[in-house]
Structures are given as structure tokens and as C-alpha cells.
Swiss-Prot record:
GO terms for biological process: adenosine catabolic process; hypoxanthine salvage; inosine biosynthetic process; nucleotide metabolic process; purine ribonucleoside monophosphate biosynthetic process. This is Adenosine deaminase. It comes from the Bacteria. Zn(2+) binds at residues 12, 14, 197, 278. InterPro entries: A_deaminase, A_deaminase_dom, Ado/ade_deaminase, Metal_Hydrolase. GO terms for molecular function: 2'-deoxyadenosine deaminase activity; adenosine deaminase activity; zinc ion binding. Its EC number is 3.5.4.4. It comes from Edwardsiella ictaluri (strain 93-146).
Length: 333
């Protein structure tokens, strides 16, 4: 199902949602932190989804053990480096890794700017070492409120030259996008691209808000766009990309089954949508699973799966020249 002549791309992949269970165990032992289990297989159910959970917030709780072991900036740097190693191992040609410095810092009171620097350092070093190009997306975790997001934005802006875009993630129902208009104005003024988690836990209005009030060029998840025919038309006509995460949406009970996921309808409607992992270590999957197992189960035809792969490159926050480099690299293989 994957076209080997074309780049394999993951655009919606949380760095802080992809901390290896083995690394959680090792860092917990290194820093003498209490974990729910002291052996890998016993720890796995606490940090990885084995079945669907009732809602997004329950899913996010699985991520908490990963950030609970980030006791130092060196630990942050390590997980950043390992994230890029995981891309190489998964056969991914380009990725945009997103991270929330506040979420990563808050358990152990790490300096926000230090976390940003550690992530940039770890990703840059690994990208050079393993040869996978990566861009970073900064996340504001809306769950912590407007002031925490302002602090988070300040820290991210300290690394503005190494960050490509700003995202808003977390509790979509409790903290709607209109609370963060001024934050996104600053991000756009800094020259960043904008992608927003919307239409996952909340309805189509959340997506309209992300587009009209926050300036979203891409929508993370966007499942509930299917509720609004006018929005579907708008997404297609204005080439606003949808970062689809099939397995994640099943595991969070955002959709009751993969067969009922709207991605196939998005593609039929001419919406530029692609396939992504979201939080691969928590989900226990990789990008190839989304192409080879999840997408067929969601009713995508072979042609739609290929189109989703092609869409990944067109949606990427890359210059035309950077996109051509990725195309050329595959054709030379």
C-alpha cells in the first residue's frame, strides 16, 4: 500500500507521546523515581494502550508516565534523540515532531527555555547522525490555561529559528480556541506556520474557530468536520490539510470503529488529508501500520491510500525546494 517511489511522511507525531517504554523504565531507575512497575512487560500496560479508552483525556493520561521521568534536561535531550532514531527504524523519510515544553517541564519544574533548547539539540544531533530530516512544531498545552500557554509560547519563541510552526493541543472542550487568539497572532507575526488540534473532542465549530480565529493552515484530527458540509467544502476549496490519525482516533473512542472514520469521505471530497501516527509509543503502532492495516480497515481504496501518502508531502511545512529534495532522494534509491 505504500508507494516506495515517494517519500513516507509523518506530520502529526508527538515527540512527548513517543517515549519508549524501555526508556521510561531506565530513566525511572536512573533518577530513582517511583513507577507503577519495575519490569518492562509489567510497565507496558501503564504506558501503552491495549484497547480503546473512554475519551481523549483518558488517553492522555497514558502519556503522563513518559513525561514523569523527564527529571533533567539530559533526559529531554535523550528522548528527542531517540524519537529521530525511531523515525529511521520505521522507514520514515521526513517528519514534523511536535512537543509541549510546559507538559515536559511541569512534573520536575524544569526551565521551559531549557526544555526547548534540549529538544532542538537532541533532534538536530540525531537528524545529522541518522539522516532523517525533521522539522519541529511547538505545542501550547491548552489544558494548563492561558497564562501557562503564554509562558510556553515565550519559551518556544526563544528557539523560533529552529521551530517551523505552532500548535494548540490538550483539552479541546474545556479550553476552546478563542481563548488563545493573541497567542497565535504572535506566532504568525514570528513567521510560523499554524496547525491546530480541532474537531477531535469538540465539534465542527472548533475547526471553524481554528481557521478563522487562529489562522490554521492544517487541522489535527479534524474528525468532526464530517458534521458540516459547508466546512467540508471550505477545507477542500482552501487547501487546508487534515492530519488524520486513524488508530489514535479509534483508541480515544473519537470514532466507534475504523470503518466509521470519515477519512475516506474527506479524500472523496477533495480535502487534502494524510496518514499520521499521533503518539506511536503509547498506541503501540508505527506509520506502516496506518497504511497497511488501519487505512484498509477504514475503507480506503488502494488509490486513496496512495493519495494520502502524496498529500503528506504537499501538506508539509517545507519550501518547494525542500520538497523536491525529498522527491529526488526517493527516485535515486
Amino acid at each position: 500500500m505504500i508507494d516506495s517511489r515517494f517519500p513516507l511522511i509523518d506530520l502529526h507525531r508527538h515527540l512527548d507521546g513517543n517515549i519508549r517504554p524501555q526508556t521510561i523504565l531506565e530513566l525511572g531507575q536512573q533518577y530513582r523515581l517511583a513507577l507503577p512497575a519495575n519490569e518492562l512487560e509489567a510497565l507496558r500496560p501503564h504506558v501503552q494502550i491495549s484497547d480503546s479508552v473512554p475519551d481523549l483525556v483518558s488517553f492522555l493520561q497514558k502519556l503522563d508516565w513518559g513525561v514523569a521521568v523527564l527529571a533533567t534536561l539530559d533526559a529531554c535531550r535523550r528522548v528527542a534523540y531517540e524519537n529521530v532514531e525511531d523515525l529511521k527504524r520505521a522507514g520514515i523519510d521526513y517528519a514534523e515532531l511536535r512537543f509541549s515544553p510546559y507538559y515536559m517541564a511541569q512534573r520536575h519544574g524544569l526551565p521551559l527555555q531549557g526544555v526547548v533548547e534540549a529538544i532542538i539539540d537532541g533532534v538536530s544531533a540525531a537528524s545529522r547522525d541518522v539522516g532523517v530530516p525533521v522539522k519541529l512544531i511547538g505545542i501550547m498545552s491548552r489544558t494548563f490555561g492561558q497564562e501557562a500557554c503564554r509562558q510556553e509560547l515565550e519559551a518556544l519563541l526563544s528557539g523560533r529559528e529552529r521551530i517551523a510552526a505552532l500548535d494548540l493541543a490538550g483539552d479541546e472542550l474545556g479550553f476552546p480556541g478563542d481563548l488563545f487568539r493573541s497567542h497565535f497572532t504572535r506566532a504568525r507575526d514570528a513567521g510560523w506556520h499554524i496547525t491546530v488540534h480541532a474537531g477531535e473532542a469538540a465539534g465542527a465549530e472548533s475547526i471553524w474557530q481554528a481557521i478563522r480565529e487562529l489562522g490554521a493552515e492544517r487541522i489535527g484530527h479534524g474528525v468532526n468536520a464530517i458534521q458540516d458540509a459547508r466546512l467540508m467544502d471550505y477545507l477542500a476549496e482552501h487547501a487546508i490539510g487534515v492530519e488524520a490519525c486513524l488508530t489514535s482516533n479509534l483508541q480515544t473512542s473519537t470514532v466507534p470503529s475504523l470503518a466509521q472514520h470519515p477519512l475516506k469521505h474527506f479524500l472523496q471530497h477533495g480535502i487534502i488529508a494524510n496518514l499520521n501516527t499521533d503518539d506511536p509509543a503509547v498506541e503501540g503502532i508505527e506509520l506502516r501500520h496506518e497504511y497497511q492495516t488501519a487505512a484498509p480497515a477504514a475503507g480506503l481504496s488502494a488509490e486513496q491510500i496512495r493519495q494520502a501518502q502524496y498529500n503528506g508531502l504537499s501538506m508539509a511545512f517545507l519550501s518547494p525546494a525542500e520538497k523536491q529534495v525529498l522527491r529526488d532522494a526517493k527516485q535515486m534509491c
